[in-house]
């Protein structure tokens, strides 16, 4: 359709395009102009309090200061800035009286003052507030954002003294991040393009296989499920800070040129944490890249959650429509799944990002298994692709969830033993497993190689999660709160651990349809069989999550099984995959109920839709009033001791309280430390061993995870390292040595090889898909 014809036939669309064009022209004009740099002279403050100016430097001394804590010492007002991203830069010297700087290598426990920005009129538009200045540092730079259309004319920069220590501020600079102008322009362009595509599809200007009603429905469900993310702040769930820290560490690795980090070097005050070896983080590169290009950290996370909700809705819909061939039923199933109480509660109250990511791919796995087992005549590798992608998606999201996939996949294979052992199907299943391993080798190989590491998660391996089970009274919950935690053996103050009233109704509908169709020809249909297996599995997951299921007895039956199941931690986690099973069996039940009794079919849909919306609405209202919220704009806002609830990847027998300060220790007075720096996982320490006979040892504030190497920075000569006090890295320095030693984490050669195998496998899959598509087109 030509542009003139579109304008003539769709005047409202033409007006929309015109408005978008004006906004794009405005954004384009903002690309040009000089970079804003404001060099603030410390002695030109508009307000002083208990501080002095000496040689053009702002000084605050503890011995001369009698004001209290958090008192504004200097303020620079009426700073004018255009919309954009800016950095506050400060050059200073900071110290505590009586503090031994020679033994300090950084750390973040003793802030002396805060440098921040405020505005009286742009309270909502100003994002980011500044940073603290700590002992042992001399420079800091942090961003802030002005998200507005017009300029901010009353920005204030404040220096707030914390009540102890001495600080001399030499330079204060506010500088614009010019590249963010381009980020802003292309973000607006992308949003407008997305809006225009949807508008054109809905008005038949662009043809698509998707039904217009379904497109509107998927967008509506995405928006409704993402309402808590359309917020100035982040709702702080149980594990949110842990996952935000993971994202920030990936971003810092990308900035340093290290894309595949295996140790998070800045966690635990720079001692390091081994999360990447044991917790998949492929999808976290999406928010990490958004943060790297200039978005605030919490905004990057919010965008990511919206994408997860959209992906969950789209993938579950496509998986269901491929099976049932009914768009309306597929959408109902997707709607119930995305807005399920357990999913929303895990997403916003618990903040369990890995579990939520795995729920994106459960429907794809169910469809993939259905695809392979329902086809009797023609079975091709193409039919294995959904299963391969689904399992890989879960594997790159959450390892506990892949354990659930394995458990129920084995059960399904045993229930269909005759079909499973047909040579052709068995061959394709084996090929699928092989491709999954090769596709994910870059994570699997380091994970398996590190499984015997002495970390907390490998503790005693005793299965003891029966007490975390759910009571039957909780399962059909209609109203659930947006707060709480898991309380063993109690219900009060618990967050939602429920399948929800809507999905319970769905299971009942399936039971009705199953019973009524037992003696008909329908029982031989693949759709009926799928409903049976997903219905049985849904009920099993409910039973598994209950406190009455005797999980703890497995300790006396099989030690091996107990050790593996102990990784699950909470029995109610079975509800994650159970929610997917319930959604699929609900669709199967509705599919047959429509033919059996239209009243039951209609009333069931109305009841499930109403219960889902009412439940979610009540949950959102309580979430807004009863939860904690925070702005986490940049890395310094992240708690580097956010290790997850159980500190799973902390080295065993280490004391985190001893990590609050970063102390360099030597085992002899003959050994002198001349310099120290630790940036991006690379530690460099200058040492001089005045001894002539024996090795001396220097202990650096970095945890000794297997894989660290120490070598001479100039010659590459390796030094022996071992675990010292509190399992810190202890480097053996030879007699007479005078130089600089580099300590960093080095991947094994087989790990590097696996990082080549995975992209090659992905490339082969893409090429195969393109060839098959070309053949089909021809």
Predicted features and spans:
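Membrane-embedded transmembrane-helix bundle of lipid-linked glycan/lipid transferases
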Residues: 2-34, 175-625, 740-745, 750-778
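Extracytoplasmic
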Residues: 20-22, 47-49, 314, 607-695, ...
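Extra-cytoplasmic beta-strand recognition segments
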Residues: 42, 74-99, 172, 710
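Short beta-strands within extracellular/lumenal beta-sheet-rich domains
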Residues: 60-84, 138-145, 166-169, 673, ...
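Secreted extracellular polysaccharide-interacting domains
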Residues: 62-81, 97-101, 112, 122-128
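Active-site-proximal, structured, solvent-exposed surfaces of multi-pass membrane proteins
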Residues: 75, 140-145, 179-181, 657-778
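Extracellular carbohydrate recognition and processing domains
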Residues: 120-152
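Short beta-strand-plus-loop segments that form exposed binding edges in beta-rich domains
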Residues: 157-165, 745-747
